[in-house]
């Protein structure tokens, strides 16, 4: 092999064509021409390339710090927008935006300082435009009036008590307090026909239009506009709640409910009635329709005003007696409902002693009814109670039910006739048997039609538990147990014998009386227990051994109603020896049975 490991080249041979290896000297010499050298040394082919002026040393370090600060602030704002703004969360996931572990609070007015960077300002404009697009509703743009109303609402909401501000403005405008003309309804659901409404800052054109639009809703309109307040007295055709009234006026007047005060007027205040009456004569007040009755009552003078109606207790007693109201609450409520048409009821409501009057009325009605009941025979009582039952039923349902219980109907009718006549040792009926055989249903239906009383042995610890039998013609003790049988065997033998007993009465002296016919229901047959052998002759018993039948719809197959008993008594009136008493009951049907008022009903009108 050759020893040459490479090629030896002369670099001068390769690049001698374009590389100058030695400097070339110019033939022209400047040694003798120094002046020309100095003249050409300062000249240049390019003008003003170098500024030969004096340089001013600036504060370069301050400029550098300022640039670094702006750059750092810009980066900080970008990080805040990336990790804090909701736009970043929205970009990650639309559903993630609705998830929040902390409660939502209103943002502070200036949480972050406004930056001046170009890119940040562009991002802010994008976020603002997107938010505005989401919040723009489908309604047309608001008018100048809507903008003004929104500003008024915002001004009101700045106050801690908006209602107090409106009431102060009302008193400043009309010279009278809003509470002096109205009474307060705490519930927004309570209905009333008459409403007083004060509206703040309403457009004049809308007020004029409301005069015509409210005619279809109201029987009487009273309107007075004293800027910035507008006062309405509206008597609607039907009762309306506060919610309905505010919704109606908000629609008609284009105002927010914050700008409204609504309460019903005072109906018994003479001063309030005079305010409305005299105000209607003001030429600046718009009034349409007839005056409400409560304004006329308080302001106009008529032939009845000379003698103010005084309350007559006897009229109230007659009302309760005719309708058979014994309970104090029922008497008070039903009589107060007559105040719109009855002068005596109106005087009752104006009285400061309503509770005492109601108590006295209920007491007198019970006295009258007790005296009338004692005067009546059983036949008259039954006839009177059957007259109050409307329509007729099937008497055969009662007969079929008695036969269904394997009871001889003729035997039952004989015992039932002696029971109604309250004969000694025959005035107590016992219906015994297993549960669900119809014992309580049968006896309760008879108590219902004859308006009897039910005694409860649960009150036996009280000495007055037998007091209700003093005010009835028929009594019932339901579900008699061994404890009750022992009590009857020890203490009530004389009563079952038909003799007089001494009955303890609450708040009254003990009275002497006989027991009325008494019915008992029990699961115990005392006729087979010698423990109660002294009651065997005093109690007439019937066994109900068959379960009460029901149809496919779980309704009773035997209709034991008031109508059924009415038909039963009318059908068997003669068999029960009630015929003579029926004739007595028919006498004087056209005449009032009892008159407890001082006025002569037969005199001139």
UniProtKB/Swiss-Prot annotation:
Keyword Cell cycle recorded: no
EC number: 5.6.2.4
Domain (SF3 helicase) ranges: 407-557
UniProt xrefs under HAMAP family: PPV_E1
Protein name: Replication protein E1
Catalytic activity: Couples ATP hydrolysis with the unwinding of duplex DNA by translocating in the 3'-5' direction; ATP + H2O = ADP + phosphate + H(+)
Family recorded in the similarity comment: Belongs to the papillomaviridae E1 protein family.
Coiled coil: none
Molecular-function GO term, any one: DNA helicase activity
Cross-link (Glycyl lysine isopeptide (Lys-Gly) (interchain with G-Cter in SUMO)): 514
Gene Ontology cellular component terms for the protein in this record: host cell nucleus
PTM text: Phosphorylated. Sumoylated.
Biological process (GO), any one: DNA replication
Domain of life: Viruses
Chain's role: ATP-dependent DNA 3'-5' helicase required for initiation of viral DNA replication. It forms a complex with the viral E2 protein. The E1-E2 complex binds to the replication origin which contains binding sites for both proteins. During the initial step, a dimer of E1 interacts with a dimer of protein E2 leading to a complex that binds the viral origin of replication with high specificity. Then, a second dimer of E1 displaces the E2 dimer in an ATP-dependent manner to form the E1 tetramer.
Motif window: Nuclear export signal: 92-101
Keyword vocabulary terms for this entry: ATP-binding, DNA replication, DNA-binding, Early protein, Helicase, Host nucleus, Hydrolase, Isomerase, Isopeptide bond, Nucleotide-binding, Phosphoprotein, Ubl conjugation
Keyword Ribosomal protein in annotation: no
Subunit structure: Can form hexamers. Interacts with E2 protein; this interaction increases E1 DNA binding specificity. Interacts with host DNA polymerase subunit POLA2. Interacts with host single stranded DNA-binding protein RPA1. Interacts with host TOP1; this interaction stimulates the enzymatic activity of TOP1.
Record-listed Phosphoserine modification sites: 85, 93
Subcellular location: Host nucleus
Record motif Nuclear localization signal, residues: 80-82
Binding annotation for ATP: 433-440
């Amino acid at each position: 092999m050759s020893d040459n490991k490479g090629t030896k080249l002369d670099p001068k041979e390769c690049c001698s064509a374009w590389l100058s290896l030695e400097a070339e000297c110019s033939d022209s010499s400047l040694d003798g021409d120094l002046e020309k050298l100095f003249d050409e040394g300062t000249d240049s082919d390019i003008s003003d390339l170098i500024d030969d002026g004096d340089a001013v040393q600036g504060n370069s370090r301050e400029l550098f710090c300022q640039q670094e600060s702006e750059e750092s602030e810009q980066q900080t704002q970008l990080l805040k927008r990336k990790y804090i703004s909701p736009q970043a969360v929205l970009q990650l996931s639309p559903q993630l935006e609705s998830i929040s572990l902390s409660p939502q609070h209103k943002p502070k007015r200036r949480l972050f300082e406004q930056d001046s960077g170009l890119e940040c300002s562009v991002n802010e404009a994008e976020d603002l435009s997107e938010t505005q697009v989401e919040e723009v509703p489908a309604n047309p743009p608001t008018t100048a009036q809507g903008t003004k109303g929104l500003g008024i609402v915002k001004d009101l909401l700045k106050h801690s008590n908006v209602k107090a501000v409106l009431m102060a403005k009302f008193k400043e405008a009309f010279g009278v307090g809003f509470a002096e003309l109205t009474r307060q309804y705490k519930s927004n659901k309570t209905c009333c026909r008459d409403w007083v409404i004060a509206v703040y800052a309403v457009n004049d054109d809308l007020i004029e239009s409301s005069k015509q639009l409210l005619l279809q809703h109201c029987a009487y309109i009273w309107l007075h506009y004293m800027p910035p307040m507008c006062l309405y007295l509206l008597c609607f055709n039907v009762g309306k709640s506060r919610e309905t009234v505010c919704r109606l006026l908000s629609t008609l007047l284009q105002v927010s409910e914050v700008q409204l005060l609504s309460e019903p007027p005072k109906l018994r205040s003479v001063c309030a009635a005079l305010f409305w009456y005299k105000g209607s004569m003001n030429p600046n007040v718009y009034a349409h329709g007839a005056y409400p009755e409560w304004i006329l009552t308080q302001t106009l003078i008529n032939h009845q005003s000379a003698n103010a109606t005084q309350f007559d207790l006897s009229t109230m007693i007659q009302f309760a007696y005719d309708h058979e109201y014994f309970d104090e609450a029922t008497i008070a409520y039903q009589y107060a409902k007559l105040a719109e048409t009855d002068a005596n009821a109106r005087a009752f409501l104006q009285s400061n002693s309503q509770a005492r009057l109601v108590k006295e009325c209920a007491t007198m009605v019970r006295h009258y009814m007790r005296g009338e009941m004692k005067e009546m025979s059983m036949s008259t009582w039954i006839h009177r109670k059957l007259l109050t039952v409307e329509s007729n039923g099937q008497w055969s349902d009662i007969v079929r039910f008695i036969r269904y219980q394997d009871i001889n109907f003729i035997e039952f009718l004989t015992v039932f006739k002696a029971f109604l006549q309250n004969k000694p040792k025959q005035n107590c009926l016992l219906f015994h048997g297993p549960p669900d055989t119809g014992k309580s249903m049968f006896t309760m239906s008879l108590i219902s039609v004859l308006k009897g009383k039910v005694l409860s042995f649960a009150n036996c610890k009280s000495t007055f538990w037998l007091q209700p039998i003093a005010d009835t013609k028929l009594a019932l003790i339901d579900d008699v147990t061994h404890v009750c049988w022992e009590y009857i065997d020890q203490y009530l033998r004389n009563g079952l014998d038909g003799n007089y007993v001494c009955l303890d009465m609450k708040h009254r002296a003990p009275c002497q009386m006989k027991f009325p016919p008494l019915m008992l229901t029990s699961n115990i047959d005392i006729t087979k227990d010698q423990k109660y052998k002294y009651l065997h002759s005093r109690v007439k018993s019937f066994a109900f051994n068959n379960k009460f039948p029901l149809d496919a719809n779980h309704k009773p197959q035997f209709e034991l109603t008031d109508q059924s008993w009415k038909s039963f008594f009318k059908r068997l009136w003669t068999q029960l020896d009630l015929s003579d008493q029926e004739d007595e009951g028919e006498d004087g049907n056209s005449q009032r049975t009892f008159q407890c008022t001082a006025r002569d009903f037969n005199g001139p009108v």
